[in-house]
């Protein structure tokens, strides 16, 4: 392997991956290739050493096993962001919140509800990242993908991505790697429609209305901080992958059954395929409150948000998985509803 083969990308041996993830767990990589440009990223993907490599960017939505033998990792660190005629183009390794800030600095609305989400721009289309009533599928114009099977890279449209709730064709694909993403934003400086009740109330706006996008960003960040969902090194509640489970979509019959079994209202929202339930409510009402299982546990639920599985400073992946499995199984036993992990699990399963 030569520098020319990798277009100058840095190669390191025996690198601990835990510090490169927001959950701060994971194995030691035998080889870490850091690509700081799209040229280097493509070269690494085409090189023999990179053909089966694990792709790692912001590390905010992945759970890596404690031990993975003979592991080569390509770290996506190309980070250029450009703006032209209301189109924001972000290289895959660009910090996501930097993309949001850049859009706002150019007077463009549409991404502000997604403020404060950790990770990289390239990860956002993979699972159609969303929060507070918005998702990237609302604004993505096209995505540049590298196909590891053919060695080609092409721009594809949202129709090719088959976006759904926290999913896309990329989520379960090993061969497609995001190189760049383009977002078509509101040149009039309007925010995205404020569909999320808590956010609309914070801004004193009717649901579905709009507001100044900078004010929306400020409100979103305040809400996220209150839930431990903005990265903060001293705050162990932020050592997580955010929400560990997606909000389940159930049939109308299952929703009615659940409502009849519990006291009080069941938080729910209309969904194209049924009724969406609040996973956090299910977790807490199955007996797993904030901070479960207690102060001495290496992995515990956030003290601010029961849907986040957190590392209290010395957890292993095995600890994290064991807690997530306990919560998932408890919700299934209590309510007959299966929770699905939101992060990508690599080398480990629930």
Swiss-Prot record:
<dbReference type="GO" id="GO:0071949">
    <property type="term" value="F:FAD binding"/>
</dbReference>
<keyword id="KW-0961">Cell wall biogenesis/degradation</keyword>
<keyword id="KW-0560">Oxidoreductase</keyword>
<dbReference type="InterPro" id="IPR016167">
    <property type="entry name" value="FAD-bd_PCMH_sub1"/>
</dbReference>
<keyword id="KW-0963">Cytoplasm</keyword>
<dbReference type="GO" id="GO:0008762">
    <property type="term" value="F:UDP-N-acetylmuramate dehydrogenase activity"/>
</dbReference>
<comment type="similarity">
    <text>Belongs to the MurB family.</text>
</comment>
<feature type="active site">
    <location>
        <position position="342"/>
    </location>
</feature>
<feature type="active site" description="Proton donor">
    <location>
        <position position="243"/>
    </location>
</feature>
<dbReference type="GO" id="GO:0071555">
    <property type="term" value="P:cell wall organization"/>
</dbReference>
<dbReference type="GO" id="GO:0009252">
    <property type="term" value="P:peptidoglycan biosynthetic process"/>
</dbReference>
<dbReference type="InterPro" id="IPR011601">
    <property type="entry name" value="MurB_C"/>
</dbReference>
<dbReference type="GO" id="GO:0051301">
    <property type="term" value="P:cell division"/>
</dbReference>
<dbReference type="InterPro" id="IPR016166">
    <property type="entry name" value="FAD-bd_PCMH"/>
</dbReference>
<keyword id="KW-0285">Flavoprotein</keyword>
<dbReference type="GO" id="GO:0008360">
    <property type="term" value="P:regulation of cell shape"/>
</dbReference>
<dbReference type="InterPro" id="IPR036318">
    <property type="entry name" value="FAD-bd_PCMH-like_sf"/>
</dbReference>
<dbReference type="GO" id="GO:0005829">
    <property type="term" value="C:cytosol"/>
</dbReference>
<keyword id="KW-0131">Cell cycle</keyword>
<feature type="active site">
    <location>
        <position position="166"/>
    </location>
</feature>
<comment type="function">
    <text>Cell wall formation.</text>
</comment>
<dbReference type="InterPro" id="IPR003170">
    <property type="entry name" value="MurB"/>
</dbReference>
<protein>
    <recommendedName>
        <fullName>UDP-N-acetylenolpyruvoylglucosamine reductase</fullName>
        <ecNumber>1.3.1.98</ecNumber>
    </recommendedName>
</protein>
<feature type="domain" description="FAD-binding PCMH-type">
    <location>
        <begin position="25"/>
        <end position="194"/>
    </location>
</feature>
<dbReference type="InterPro" id="IPR006094">
    <property type="entry name" value="Oxid_FAD_bind_N"/>
</dbReference>
<dbReference type="InterPro" id="IPR036635">
    <property type="entry name" value="MurB_C_sf"/>
</dbReference>
<comment type="pathway">
    <text>Cell wall biogenesis; peptidoglycan biosynthesis.</text>
</comment>
<dbReference type="InterPro" id="IPR016169">
    <property type="entry name" value="FAD-bd_PCMH_sub2"/>
</dbReference>
<keyword id="KW-0132">Cell division</keyword>
<keyword id="KW-0133">Cell shape</keyword>
<dbReference type="Pfam" id="PF02873">
    <property type="entry name" value="MurB_C"/>
</dbReference>
<keyword id="KW-0274">FAD</keyword>
<keyword id="KW-0521">NADP</keyword>
<dbReference type="Pfam" id="PF01565">
    <property type="entry name" value="FAD_binding_4"/>
</dbReference>
<keyword id="KW-0573">Peptidoglycan synthesis</keyword>
């Amino acid at each position: 392997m030569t520098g020319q083969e990798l277009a100058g990308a840095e190669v390191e041996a025996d690198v601990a991956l835990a510090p490169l993830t927001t959950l701060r767990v994971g194995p030691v990589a035998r080889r870490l290739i850091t690509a700081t440009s799209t040229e280097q990223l493509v070269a690494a993907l085409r090189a023999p050493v990179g053909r089966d490599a694990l792709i790692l960017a912001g590390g905010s939505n992945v759970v890596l096993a404690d031990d993975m033998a003979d592991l080569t990792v390509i770290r996506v660190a190309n980070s250029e962001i450009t703006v032209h005629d209301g189109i924001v183009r972000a290289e895959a390794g660009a910090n996501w919140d930097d993309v949001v800030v850049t859009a706002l600095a150019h007077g463009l609305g549409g991404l502000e509800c997604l403020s404060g989400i950790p990770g990289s721009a390239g990860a956002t289309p993979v699972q159609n990242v969303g929060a507070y009533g918005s998702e990237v599928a609302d604004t993505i114009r096209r995505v540049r993908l590298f196909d590891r099977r053919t060695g080609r890279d092409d721009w594809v449209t949202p129709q090719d991505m088959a976006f759904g709730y926290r999913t896309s064709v990329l989520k379960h694909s090993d061969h497609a790697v995001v190189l760049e993403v383009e977002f078509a934003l509101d040149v009039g400086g309007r925010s995205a429609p404020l569909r999320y009740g808590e956010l609309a109330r914070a801004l004193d706006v009717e649901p579905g209305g709009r507001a100044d996008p900078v004010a929306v960003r400020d409100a979103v960040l305040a809400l996220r901080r209150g839930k431990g969902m903005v990265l903060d090194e001293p705050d162990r509640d932020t050592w997580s992958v955010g929400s560990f489970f997606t909000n389940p979509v159930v049939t109308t019959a299952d929703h009615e059954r659940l409502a009849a079994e519990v006291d009080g209202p069941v938080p729910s929202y209309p969904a194209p395929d049924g009724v969406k339930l609040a996973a956090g409510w299910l977790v807490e009402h199955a007996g797993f409150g904030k901070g479960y299982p207690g102060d001495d546990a290496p992995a515990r639920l956030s003290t601010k948000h029961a849907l986040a599985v957190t590392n209290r400073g010395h957890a292993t992946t095995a600890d994290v998985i064991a807690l997530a499995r306990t919560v998932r199984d408890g919700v299934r036993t209590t309510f007959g509803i299966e929770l699905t992990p939101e992060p990508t699990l690599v080398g480990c399963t629930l």
